Protein backbone atom coordinates (compact mmCIF):
# COMPACT_ATOMS: atom_id res chain seq x y z
CA UNK A 1 0.00 0.00 0.00
CA UNK A 2 3.05 2.28 0.19
CA UNK A 3 2.81 3.01 -3.54
CA UNK A 4 -0.69 4.47 -3.05
CA UNK A 5 0.74 7.18 -0.79
CA UNK A 6 3.16 8.26 -3.53
CA UNK A 7 0.25 9.41 -5.71
CA UNK A 8 -2.35 12.13 -5.41
CA UNK A 9 -5.74 12.19 -7.04
CA UNK A 10 -6.90 15.10 -9.18
CA UNK A 11 -10.68 15.45 -9.34
CA UNK A 12 -13.08 17.67 -11.22
CA UNK A 13 -16.85 17.34 -10.83
CA UNK A 14 -19.61 18.02 -13.32
CA UNK A 15 -22.91 18.42 -11.49
CA UNK A 16 -26.22 18.31 -13.37
CA UNK A 17 -29.04 20.14 -11.59
CA UNK A 18 -32.63 19.84 -12.77
CA UNK A 19 -34.32 23.23 -12.56
CA UNK A 20 -37.66 23.68 -10.82
CA UNK A 21 -39.59 25.03 -13.81
CA UNK A 22 -43.18 24.10 -14.62
CA UNK A 23 -42.42 23.57 -18.31
CA UNK A 24 -39.51 22.26 -20.37
CA UNK A 25 -36.65 24.33 -21.72
CA UNK A 26 -37.84 24.67 -25.35
CA UNK A 27 -41.55 23.78 -25.26
CA UNK A 28 -44.61 23.98 -23.01
CA UNK A 29 -44.66 20.31 -21.95
CA UNK A 30 -44.87 19.85 -18.16
CA UNK A 31 -41.91 18.60 -16.12
CA UNK A 32 -43.86 16.62 -13.50
CA UNK A 33 -41.76 13.77 -12.10
CA UNK A 34 -43.23 10.26 -12.16
CA UNK A 35 -45.84 10.82 -14.88
CA UNK A 36 -46.92 7.89 -17.04
CA UNK A 37 -44.17 7.19 -19.64
CA UNK A 38 -44.27 9.25 -22.84
CA UNK A 39 -47.25 11.39 -21.77
CA UNK A 40 -45.29 14.65 -21.39
CA UNK A 41 -43.94 15.00 -24.92
CA UNK A 42 -44.63 17.04 -28.04
CA UNK A 43 -43.12 17.42 -31.53
CA UNK A 44 -40.53 19.90 -30.18
CA UNK A 45 -39.02 17.75 -27.43
CA UNK A 46 -39.32 14.65 -29.65
CA UNK A 47 -37.30 16.40 -32.36
CA UNK A 48 -39.82 15.97 -35.18
CA UNK A 49 -39.13 17.75 -38.49
CA UNK A 50 -40.38 21.30 -39.00
CA UNK A 51 -40.65 22.37 -35.36
CA UNK A 52 -38.86 25.31 -33.74
CA UNK A 53 -37.67 25.55 -30.12
CA UNK A 54 -38.48 28.61 -27.98
CA UNK A 55 -36.21 29.20 -24.98
CA UNK A 56 -37.89 29.25 -21.56
CA UNK A 57 -36.88 32.61 -20.03
CA UNK A 58 -36.98 31.23 -16.48
CA UNK A 59 -34.24 28.71 -17.32
CA UNK A 60 -31.87 31.58 -18.12
CA UNK A 61 -32.88 33.45 -14.96
CA UNK A 62 -32.33 30.38 -12.76
CA UNK A 63 -28.94 29.68 -14.33
CA UNK A 64 -27.85 33.28 -13.70
CA UNK A 65 -28.97 32.99 -10.06
CA UNK A 66 -26.86 29.84 -9.71
CA UNK A 67 -23.90 31.73 -11.15
CA UNK A 68 -24.35 34.71 -8.84
CA UNK A 69 -24.69 32.41 -5.81
CA UNK A 70 -21.37 30.74 -6.70
CA UNK A 71 -19.43 33.96 -7.38
CA UNK A 72 -19.39 33.54 -11.17
CA UNK A 73 -18.94 36.20 -13.81
CA UNK A 74 -22.19 36.45 -15.82
CA UNK A 75 -21.95 36.72 -19.60
CA UNK A 76 -23.86 39.60 -21.18
CA UNK A 77 -23.83 37.65 -24.44
CA UNK A 78 -23.98 33.87 -24.80
CA UNK A 79 -25.34 31.36 -27.27
CA UNK A 80 -26.65 27.82 -27.50
CA UNK A 81 -25.01 25.02 -29.43
CA UNK A 82 -25.88 21.61 -30.78
CA UNK A 83 -23.93 18.71 -29.29
CA UNK A 84 -24.18 15.88 -31.81
CA UNK A 85 -24.18 12.24 -30.74
CA UNK A 86 -26.36 9.19 -31.19
CA UNK A 87 -27.98 7.40 -28.28
CA UNK A 88 -31.44 5.79 -28.07
CA UNK A 89 -32.71 8.25 -25.42
CA UNK A 90 -31.90 11.30 -27.60
CA UNK A 91 -34.61 11.52 -30.32
CA UNK A 92 -33.05 14.49 -32.18
CA UNK A 93 -29.57 12.85 -32.26
CA UNK A 94 -28.26 16.12 -30.82
CA UNK A 95 -28.56 17.89 -27.48
CA UNK A 96 -28.97 21.65 -27.22
CA UNK A 97 -26.30 22.81 -24.79
CA UNK A 98 -23.67 25.58 -24.61
CA UNK A 99 -20.11 25.14 -25.84
CA UNK A 100 -17.67 28.04 -25.93
CA UNK A 101 -19.74 30.92 -24.49
CA UNK A 102 -21.54 29.71 -21.35
CA UNK A 103 -23.83 31.90 -19.25
CA UNK A 104 -21.56 31.83 -16.17
CA UNK A 105 -17.79 31.47 -15.76
CA UNK A 106 -14.90 31.75 -13.28
CA UNK A 107 -16.73 31.22 -10.00
CA UNK A 108 -15.81 29.46 -6.78
CA UNK A 109 -17.13 28.24 -3.46
CA UNK A 110 -15.45 27.59 -0.13
CA UNK A 111 -15.55 24.17 1.53
CA UNK A 112 -14.72 23.08 5.07
CA UNK A 113 -13.01 19.79 5.91
CA UNK A 114 -10.96 18.51 8.85
CA UNK A 115 -7.92 20.10 7.16
CA UNK A 116 -9.59 23.54 7.17
CA UNK A 117 -11.06 25.84 4.50
CA UNK A 118 -10.37 25.44 0.80
CA UNK A 119 -11.44 27.32 -2.30
CA UNK A 120 -12.78 25.17 -5.16
CA UNK A 121 -12.97 26.92 -8.51
CA UNK A 122 -16.00 26.69 -10.78
CA UNK A 123 -15.04 26.74 -14.45
CA UNK A 124 -18.50 27.35 -15.87
CA UNK A 125 -22.25 26.95 -15.53
CA UNK A 126 -24.26 26.41 -18.68
CA UNK A 127 -27.84 25.51 -19.60
CA UNK A 128 -28.85 22.41 -21.54
CA UNK A 129 -31.72 20.00 -22.10
CA UNK A 130 -31.91 16.59 -20.47
CA UNK A 131 -32.15 13.36 -22.45
CA UNK A 132 -34.79 10.65 -22.08
CA UNK A 133 -34.57 7.59 -19.88
CA UNK A 134 -33.91 3.97 -20.80
CA UNK A 135 -36.06 1.50 -18.85
CA UNK A 136 -34.76 -2.08 -18.80
CA UNK A 137 -37.35 -4.84 -18.45
CA UNK A 138 -36.78 -8.62 -18.44
CA UNK A 139 -39.98 -9.29 -20.39
CA UNK A 140 -40.06 -6.44 -22.92
CA UNK A 141 -36.37 -5.57 -23.20
CA UNK A 142 -35.16 -1.97 -23.15
CA UNK A 143 -37.83 0.72 -23.53
CA UNK A 144 -37.51 4.50 -23.84
CA UNK A 145 -39.40 7.04 -21.74
CA UNK A 146 -39.12 10.45 -23.42
CA UNK A 147 -40.84 12.43 -20.66
CA UNK A 148 -37.44 13.70 -19.48
CA UNK A 149 -36.39 14.89 -22.97
CA UNK A 150 -36.12 18.67 -22.83
CA UNK A 151 -36.29 18.99 -19.05
CA UNK A 152 -34.07 22.00 -18.22
CA UNK A 153 -30.68 21.43 -16.60
CA UNK A 154 -27.75 23.49 -15.55
CA UNK A 155 -24.34 21.84 -15.62
CA UNK A 156 -21.89 23.15 -13.03
CA UNK A 157 -18.30 22.27 -13.90
CA UNK A 158 -15.63 22.56 -11.21
CA UNK A 159 -11.93 23.19 -11.69
CA UNK A 160 -9.72 20.11 -11.02
CA UNK A 161 -9.01 21.48 -7.52
CA UNK A 162 -10.33 18.53 -5.50
CA UNK A 163 -7.76 16.17 -3.98
CA UNK A 164 -9.75 13.65 -1.92
CA UNK A 165 -13.11 11.93 -1.58
CA UNK A 166 -13.78 14.02 1.54
CA UNK A 167 -13.23 17.24 -0.39
CA UNK A 168 -15.50 16.00 -3.19
CA UNK A 169 -18.30 15.24 -0.73
CA UNK A 170 -17.84 18.61 1.02
CA UNK A 171 -18.02 20.38 -2.35
CA UNK A 172 -21.17 18.51 -3.41
CA UNK A 173 -22.97 19.12 -0.12
CA UNK A 174 -22.04 22.82 -0.11
CA UNK A 175 -23.10 23.24 -3.73
CA UNK A 176 -26.40 21.45 -3.13
CA UNK A 177 -27.15 23.68 -0.14
CA UNK A 178 -26.40 26.83 -2.16
CA UNK A 179 -28.68 25.67 -4.98
CA UNK A 180 -31.47 24.90 -2.49
CA UNK A 181 -31.17 28.37 -0.94
CA UNK A 182 -31.20 29.95 -4.40
CA UNK A 183 -34.65 28.43 -4.87
CA UNK A 184 -33.98 27.14 -8.39
CA UNK A 185 -34.14 23.38 -7.73
CA UNK A 186 -35.30 20.97 -5.05
CA UNK A 187 -32.15 18.87 -5.71
CA UNK A 188 -33.97 15.58 -5.03
CA UNK A 189 -31.33 12.96 -5.62
CA UNK A 190 -33.81 10.08 -5.78
CA UNK A 191 -35.50 11.83 -8.72
CA UNK A 192 -32.24 12.53 -10.55
CA UNK A 193 -32.48 16.28 -9.92
CA UNK A 194 -28.91 16.45 -8.55
CA UNK A 195 -26.45 14.05 -10.12
CA UNK A 196 -22.73 14.08 -10.62
CA UNK A 197 -20.07 13.00 -13.12
CA UNK A 198 -16.64 12.45 -11.56
CA UNK A 199 -13.49 13.12 -13.61
CA UNK A 200 -10.44 11.59 -11.94
CA UNK A 201 -6.77 11.17 -12.74
CA UNK A 202 -3.71 10.39 -10.62
CA UNK A 203 -0.16 11.70 -10.63
CA UNK A 204 2.96 11.37 -8.52
CA UNK A 205 3.02 13.85 -5.63
CA UNK A 206 4.96 16.96 -6.63
CA UNK A 207 4.22 16.45 -10.31
CA UNK A 208 2.44 19.35 -12.07
CA UNK A 209 1.31 17.57 -15.22
CA UNK A 210 -2.12 15.94 -15.17
CA UNK A 211 -2.51 12.21 -15.74
CA UNK A 212 -5.02 10.59 -18.11
CA UNK A 213 -8.51 10.98 -16.69
CA UNK A 214 -11.52 8.73 -16.59
CA UNK A 215 -15.11 9.87 -16.13
CA UNK A 216 -17.69 8.15 -13.94
CA UNK A 217 -21.21 9.12 -15.00
CA UNK A 218 -24.48 9.93 -13.24
CA UNK A 219 -23.74 9.21 -9.58
CA UNK A 220 -26.61 10.50 -7.46
CA UNK A 221 -25.36 10.32 -3.87
CA UNK A 222 -22.37 11.71 -1.99
CA UNK A 223 -21.76 8.29 -0.43
CA UNK A 224 -21.47 6.65 -3.85
CA UNK A 225 -19.30 9.49 -5.16
CA UNK A 226 -16.85 8.85 -2.29
CA UNK A 227 -16.86 5.09 -2.95
CA UNK A 228 -16.34 5.57 -6.69
CA UNK A 229 -13.43 7.95 -6.10
CA UNK A 230 -11.66 5.64 -3.65
CA UNK A 231 -12.02 2.62 -5.92
CA UNK A 232 -10.98 4.41 -9.11
CA UNK A 233 -7.98 6.02 -7.39
CA UNK A 234 -6.67 2.63 -6.26
CA UNK A 235 -7.41 1.06 -9.65
CA UNK A 236 -5.47 3.72 -11.55
CA UNK A 237 -2.47 3.61 -9.20
CA UNK A 238 -2.32 -0.20 -9.35
CA UNK A 239 -2.60 -0.11 -13.16
CA UNK A 240 0.29 2.37 -13.46
CA UNK A 241 2.47 0.54 -10.92
CA UNK A 242 1.98 -2.78 -12.72
CA UNK A 243 3.17 -1.25 -15.99
CA UNK A 244 -0.25 -0.66 -17.51
CA UNK A 245 -1.68 2.44 -19.16
CA UNK A 246 -4.74 4.46 -18.14
CA UNK A 247 -7.24 4.75 -21.00
CA UNK A 248 -9.33 7.91 -21.33
CA UNK A 249 -12.78 6.38 -21.00
CA UNK A 250 -16.24 6.65 -19.49
CA UNK A 251 -16.83 4.23 -16.64
CA UNK A 252 -19.91 3.11 -14.73
CA UNK A 253 -19.99 2.89 -10.94
CA UNK A 254 -21.78 -0.21 -9.66
CA UNK A 255 -23.48 0.56 -6.33
CA UNK A 256 -23.70 -3.10 -5.32
CA UNK A 257 -20.04 -4.00 -5.85
CA UNK A 258 -18.52 -0.58 -5.15
CA UNK A 259 -16.44 -0.93 -8.33
CA UNK A 260 -16.20 0.94 -11.63
CA UNK A 261 -16.48 -0.73 -15.04
CA UNK A 262 -15.49 0.50 -18.51
CA UNK A 263 -18.45 1.61 -20.66
CA UNK A 264 -16.92 3.31 -23.69
CA UNK A 265 -13.91 5.31 -24.84
CA UNK A 266 -14.18 8.88 -23.59
CA UNK A 267 -15.07 11.39 -26.30
CA UNK A 268 -13.34 14.73 -26.88
CA UNK A 269 -15.18 17.96 -27.73
CA UNK A 270 -14.33 17.52 -31.43
CA UNK A 271 -16.21 14.21 -31.47
CA UNK A 272 -19.45 16.06 -30.69
CA UNK A 273 -19.11 18.46 -33.67
CA UNK A 274 -20.50 21.43 -31.75
CA UNK A 275 -21.97 24.28 -33.77
CA UNK A 276 -24.32 27.19 -32.90
CA UNK A 277 -28.00 26.23 -32.99
CA UNK A 278 -29.44 28.09 -36.01
CA UNK A 279 -32.98 28.02 -34.58
CA UNK A 280 -32.15 29.90 -31.37
CA UNK A 281 -31.06 33.55 -31.09
CA UNK A 282 -28.19 34.57 -28.77
CA UNK A 283 -28.94 35.19 -25.10
CA UNK A 284 -28.36 38.83 -24.18
CA UNK A 285 -28.42 40.21 -20.64
CA UNK A 286 -28.07 43.80 -19.43
CA UNK A 287 -26.54 44.96 -16.14
CA UNK A 288 -30.06 45.77 -14.94
CA UNK A 289 -31.22 42.22 -15.73
CA UNK A 290 -28.37 40.77 -13.67
CA UNK A 291 -28.91 43.19 -10.75
CA UNK A 292 -32.63 42.36 -10.68
CA UNK A 293 -31.92 38.62 -10.50
CA UNK A 294 -29.30 39.18 -7.80
CA UNK A 295 -31.89 41.03 -5.69
CA UNK A 296 -34.22 38.02 -5.91
CA UNK A 297 -31.70 35.65 -4.31
CA UNK A 298 -32.40 35.29 -0.61
CA UNK A 299 -29.96 34.79 2.25
CA UNK A 300 -27.33 32.24 1.23
CA UNK A 301 -25.92 29.53 3.58
CA UNK A 302 -22.67 31.31 4.53
CA UNK A 303 -24.53 34.50 5.54
CA UNK A 304 -27.08 32.53 7.50
CA UNK A 305 -24.38 30.49 9.22
CA UNK A 306 -22.80 33.66 10.59
CA UNK A 307 -26.23 34.78 11.79
CA UNK A 308 -26.90 31.46 13.56
CA UNK A 309 -23.52 31.56 15.29
CA UNK A 310 -23.78 35.24 16.30
CA UNK A 311 -27.50 35.54 17.14
CA UNK A 312 -28.13 32.10 18.63
CA UNK A 313 -24.65 31.23 19.91
CA UNK A 314 -24.56 27.95 17.97
CA UNK A 315 -21.38 26.13 17.02
CA UNK A 316 -20.25 25.95 13.39
CA UNK A 317 -21.14 22.23 13.44
CA UNK A 318 -24.72 22.79 14.66
CA UNK A 319 -25.20 25.69 12.25
CA UNK A 320 -24.06 23.61 9.28
CA UNK A 321 -26.40 20.78 10.30
CA UNK A 322 -29.41 23.11 10.52
CA UNK A 323 -28.60 24.85 7.25
CA UNK A 324 -28.58 21.73 5.06
CA UNK A 325 -32.20 22.45 4.15
CA UNK A 326 -33.82 25.93 3.96
CA UNK A 327 -37.09 24.55 5.37
CA UNK A 328 -35.24 23.20 8.41
CA UNK A 329 -33.42 26.50 8.99
CA UNK A 330 -36.72 28.39 8.71
CA UNK A 331 -38.40 26.05 11.20
CA UNK A 332 -35.49 26.50 13.64
CA UNK A 333 -35.93 30.27 13.49
CA UNK A 334 -39.67 29.89 14.14
CA UNK A 335 -38.92 27.75 17.21
CA UNK A 336 -36.30 30.28 18.37
CA UNK A 337 -39.00 32.98 18.56
CA UNK A 338 -40.58 31.13 21.50
CA UNK A 339 -37.54 30.15 23.62
CA UNK A 340 -34.02 31.26 24.49
CA UNK A 341 -32.64 27.72 24.83
CA UNK A 342 -31.23 27.76 21.30
CA UNK A 343 -28.56 25.11 21.84
CA UNK A 344 -31.16 22.69 23.23
CA UNK A 345 -33.38 23.35 20.21
CA UNK A 346 -30.41 22.58 17.94
CA UNK A 347 -29.86 19.31 19.83
CA UNK A 348 -33.52 18.35 19.35
CA UNK A 349 -33.02 18.93 15.62
CA UNK A 350 -29.83 16.89 15.32
CA UNK A 351 -30.95 14.00 17.55
CA UNK A 352 -34.69 13.75 16.90
CA UNK A 353 -36.06 15.80 14.01
CA UNK A 354 -33.37 14.85 11.48
CA UNK A 355 -33.73 11.19 12.46
CA UNK A 356 -37.51 11.20 12.13
CA UNK A 357 -37.81 13.28 8.95
CA UNK A 358 -35.39 11.07 6.99
CA UNK A 359 -34.04 12.67 3.78
CA UNK A 360 -36.34 15.64 3.11
CA UNK A 361 -37.06 17.91 6.06
CA UNK A 362 -40.54 17.67 7.49
CA UNK A 363 -41.82 18.37 11.00
CA UNK A 364 -45.50 17.98 11.98
CA UNK A 365 -44.91 19.53 15.43
CA UNK A 366 -45.85 23.20 15.93
CA UNK A 367 -42.80 25.42 16.41
CA UNK A 368 -44.26 26.69 19.69
CA UNK A 369 -44.56 23.17 21.11
CA UNK A 370 -40.98 22.29 20.14
CA UNK A 371 -39.89 25.49 21.91
CA UNK A 372 -41.86 24.51 25.03
CA UNK A 373 -40.14 21.12 25.07
CA UNK A 374 -36.71 22.79 24.85
CA UNK A 375 -37.63 25.15 27.70
CA UNK A 376 -38.82 22.27 29.91
CA UNK A 377 -35.43 20.61 29.48
CA UNK A 378 -33.47 23.86 29.79
CA UNK A 379 -35.17 24.63 33.10
CA UNK A 380 -34.43 21.07 34.31
CA UNK A 381 -38.11 20.20 34.64
CA UNK A 382 -37.63 17.09 32.48
CA UNK A 383 -34.56 15.07 31.50
CA UNK A 384 -33.24 14.05 28.08
CA UNK A 385 -34.96 10.66 28.22
CA UNK A 386 -38.34 12.35 28.66
CA UNK A 387 -37.55 14.81 25.85
CA UNK A 388 -36.96 11.90 23.49
CA UNK A 389 -40.11 10.09 24.63
CA UNK A 390 -42.33 13.17 24.41
CA UNK A 391 -41.05 14.34 21.05
CA UNK A 392 -41.59 10.90 19.54
CA UNK A 393 -45.21 11.05 20.67
CA UNK A 394 -45.62 14.66 19.50
CA UNK A 395 -44.37 13.62 16.07
CA UNK A 396 -47.21 11.10 15.80
CA UNK A 397 -49.84 13.50 17.17
CA UNK A 398 -48.91 17.03 18.21
CA UNK A 399 -49.77 18.25 21.71
CA UNK A 400 -48.65 20.76 24.36
CA UNK A 401 -45.72 19.14 26.26
CA UNK A 402 -46.20 21.38 29.32
CA UNK A 403 -49.72 20.02 29.83
CA UNK A 404 -48.53 16.44 29.28
CA UNK A 405 -45.75 16.76 31.88
CA UNK A 406 -48.20 18.07 34.48
CA UNK A 407 -50.96 15.59 33.68
CA UNK A 408 -48.73 12.50 33.46
CA UNK A 409 -46.33 13.36 36.28
CA UNK A 410 -43.28 13.34 34.01
CA UNK A 411 -41.35 16.02 35.88
CA UNK A 412 -37.73 15.18 36.63
CA UNK A 413 -36.84 14.07 40.16
CA UNK A 414 -34.36 16.66 41.45
CA UNK A 415 -34.83 16.11 45.20
CA UNK A 416 -31.41 15.02 46.47
CA UNK A 417 -32.78 13.05 49.44
CA UNK A 418 -35.05 11.03 47.15
CA UNK A 419 -32.16 10.31 44.77
CA UNK A 420 -29.85 9.27 47.64
CA UNK A 421 -32.52 6.82 48.85
CA UNK A 422 -32.84 5.36 45.35
CA UNK A 423 -29.06 4.88 45.08
CA UNK A 424 -29.00 3.11 48.46
CA UNK A 425 -31.75 0.74 47.32
CA UNK A 426 -29.81 -0.10 44.15
CA UNK A 427 -26.51 -0.69 45.97
CA UNK A 428 -28.08 -3.05 48.52
CA UNK A 429 -28.85 -5.58 45.78
CA UNK A 430 -25.85 -5.00 43.50
CA UNK A 431 -22.78 -6.37 45.28
CA UNK A 432 -21.31 -7.96 42.13
CA UNK A 433 -21.70 -4.76 40.08
CA UNK A 434 -20.07 -2.75 42.88
CA UNK A 435 -17.07 -5.10 42.93
CA UNK A 436 -16.83 -5.06 39.14
CA UNK A 437 -16.82 -1.26 39.08
CA UNK A 438 -14.17 -1.04 41.80
CA UNK A 439 -12.08 -3.48 39.75
CA UNK A 440 -12.12 -1.09 36.79
CA UNK A 441 -15.12 -2.28 34.78
CA UNK A 442 -16.85 0.93 33.62
CA UNK A 443 -19.81 -0.96 32.18
CA UNK A 444 -20.76 -1.94 35.72
CA UNK A 445 -21.38 1.75 36.47
CA UNK A 446 -23.68 1.99 33.46
CA UNK A 447 -25.61 -1.02 34.75
CA UNK A 448 -26.00 0.60 38.18
CA UNK A 449 -27.23 3.81 36.54
CA UNK A 450 -29.70 1.79 34.48
CA UNK A 451 -31.13 0.16 37.61
CA UNK A 452 -31.46 3.52 39.37
CA UNK A 453 -33.17 5.13 36.36
CA UNK A 454 -35.47 2.12 36.12
CA UNK A 455 -36.66 2.63 39.70
CA UNK A 456 -37.73 6.17 38.76
CA UNK A 457 -39.25 5.24 35.38
CA UNK A 458 -36.49 7.27 33.74
CA UNK A 459 -37.42 10.49 35.56
CA UNK A 460 -34.35 10.95 37.77
CA UNK A 461 -32.02 13.89 37.14
CA UNK A 462 -29.17 11.95 35.46
CA UNK A 463 -26.45 14.50 36.30
CA UNK A 464 -27.32 14.48 40.01
CA UNK A 465 -27.69 10.69 39.97
CA UNK A 466 -24.21 10.19 38.49
CA UNK A 467 -22.68 12.45 41.12
CA UNK A 468 -24.44 10.70 44.04
CA UNK A 469 -23.63 7.22 42.74
CA UNK A 470 -19.94 8.02 42.17
CA UNK A 471 -19.61 9.57 45.63
CA UNK A 472 -21.27 6.56 47.22
CA UNK A 473 -18.98 4.11 45.39
Regions found by a protein language model. Name each.
Residues 423, 435, 467-473:
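A carboxyl-terminal module marker
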